[in-house]
């Protein structure tokens, strides 16, 4: 794999997507092509992805009750914390309590909390590559050294555990595991997660489990929470309502100590958590108050519909990728909302790298893809498939036209 020459600390996904949008000069109302974005992981951009009526009613009832217009406790409303503990406990061999749960403003704030709590002089953290660039941004702000562990596309984007052992030392504080995977669309097996836990225990660090895409698994492997292995190694579980309930703008996330052995039960650690949350601003109180109803009353049919839509969209992507020689995917998505495809520059006449590809594609075809450099892999592309079938079909038709326009001329051999 070719890794990004530009570190993700200098690039944000939203930043580069904004630049790509700005590069599109044609306007639809002036006869230009409709802009299709397969770059941002926000399913609400497409009408086929909508949250449940249960969620909407719960928030409406909470807001109109006039009971939740004031400040909430800094760690979150007790009833919301309790509901999240019960929700996560369904998939664990032990029960969480509300004291294990801290409510955050989206999963991004949970990431910042986790890294802030682990920061200390000379500490380092192991991050997956490709991954989510917010981790490196937060680490840099907290003066945490970042060490990258490559994911292996030939093995379904599994973590290279030999590399983990080679990179870790006495100052390694944690390994980040994103499952289901963003940006790769992978889902880790029980066996692989067990090996991760055993490696972390052996090497003496904890695991940060980013499960913002939790349960969004539509392949052959079911979603297994990292917290299942909490008795082997301490796990900090990060998650949110954003993806599974299709409400990223509600900013309701959680930071959870999935740790039945009690490593985080030290009064000094708990007090440090609470003091840090005292300086944070959590989600709106009325959103928190709706959480118990949302978690307890959402019908399973809603989740099945979402999974069916994501699988159908990912299948359309995979079928089209076979028709475009300059992009290739060795791994069919099994979950989340995105996938990585490799760019074959040798087949293109005047495209220098993944960033050049994406900017020229945006200008010429009004299609937005995310350059792999933004997530740590140069000359790869991240494609988000949380979109309707019509938009995906049209986007890939344009990508194919772009390829044909820029394909190297094949001269006949004499």
Swiss-Prot record:
Keyword Transferase: yes
GO biological process: tyrosine catabolic process; vitamin E biosynthetic process
Lineage of origin: Eukaryota, Viridiplantae, Streptophyta, Embryophyta, Tracheophyta
Stimuli inducing this protein: By coronatine.
Family: Belongs to the class-I pyridoxal-phosphate-dependent aminotransferase family.
Coiled-coil spans in chain: none
GO cellular component, as recorded: cytosol
Gene Ontology molecular function: any one: pyridoxal phosphate binding
Known EC number: 2.6.1.-
Protein name, entry field: Probable aminotransferase TAT2
Cited CDD domains: AAT_like (cd00609)
Enzyme kind, highest EC tier: transferase
Cofactor needs: pyridoxal 5'-phosphate
Keyword Transferase: yes
Top-level taxon in the UniProt lineage: Eukaryota
Keywords: Aminotransferase, Pyridoxal phosphate, Transferase
């Amino acid at each position: 794999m070719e890794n990004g020459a530009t570190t993700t600390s200098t690039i944000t996904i939203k930043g580069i997507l904004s630049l790509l949008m700005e590069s599109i000069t044609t306007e639809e109302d002036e006869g230009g092509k409709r802009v299709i974005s397969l770059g941002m992981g926000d399913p609400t951009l497409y009408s086929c992805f909508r949250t449940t009526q249960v969620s909407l009613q719960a928030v409406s009832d909470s807001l109109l009750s006039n009971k939740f217009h004031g400040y909430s406790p800094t760690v979150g409303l007790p009833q919301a914390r309790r509901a999240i503990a019960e929700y996560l406990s369904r998939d664990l061999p032990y029960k969480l309590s509300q004291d294990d749960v801290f409510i955050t403003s989206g999963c991004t704030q949970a990431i910042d909390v986790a890294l802030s709590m682990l920061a200390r002089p000379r500490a380092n953290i192991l991050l997956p590559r490709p991954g989510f660039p917010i981790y490196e941004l937060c680490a840099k702000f907290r003066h945490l050294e970042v060490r990258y562990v490559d994911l292996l596309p030939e093995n379904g984007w599994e973590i290279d555990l030999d590399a983990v052992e080679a990179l870790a030392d006495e100052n390694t504080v944690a390994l980040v595991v994103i499952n289901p995977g963003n940006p790769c669309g992978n889902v880790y097996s029980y066996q692989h997660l067990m090996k991760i836990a055993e490696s972390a225990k052996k090497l003496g660090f904890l695991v940060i489990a980013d499960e913002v895409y939790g349960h969004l698994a539509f392949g052959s492997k079911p979603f297994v929470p990292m917290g299942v292995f909490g008795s082997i190694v301490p796990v900090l579980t990060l998650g949110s309502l954003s993806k599974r309930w299709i409400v990223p703008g509600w900013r309701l996330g959680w930071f959870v100590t999935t740790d039945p052995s009690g490593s985080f039960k030290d009064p000094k650690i708990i007090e440090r958590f609470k003091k840090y949350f005292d300086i944070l601003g959590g989600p709106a109180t009325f959103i928190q108050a709706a959480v118990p109803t949302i978690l307890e009353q959402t019908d399973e049919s809603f989740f099945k519909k979402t999974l069916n839509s994501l699988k159908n969209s990912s299948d359309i992507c995979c079928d089209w990728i076979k028709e475009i020689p300059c992009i290739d995917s060795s791994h069919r998505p099994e979950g989340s909302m995105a996938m990585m495809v490799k760019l074959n520059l040798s087949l293109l006449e005047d495209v220098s790298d993944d960033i050049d590809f994406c900017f020229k594609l945006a200008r010429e075809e009004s299609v937005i893809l995310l350059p792999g450099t933004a997530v740590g892999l140069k000359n790869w592309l991240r494609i988000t498939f949380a979109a309707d079938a019509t938009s995906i079909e049209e986007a890939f038709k344009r990508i194919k036209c772009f390829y044909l326009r820029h394909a190297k001329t094949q001269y006949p051999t004499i």
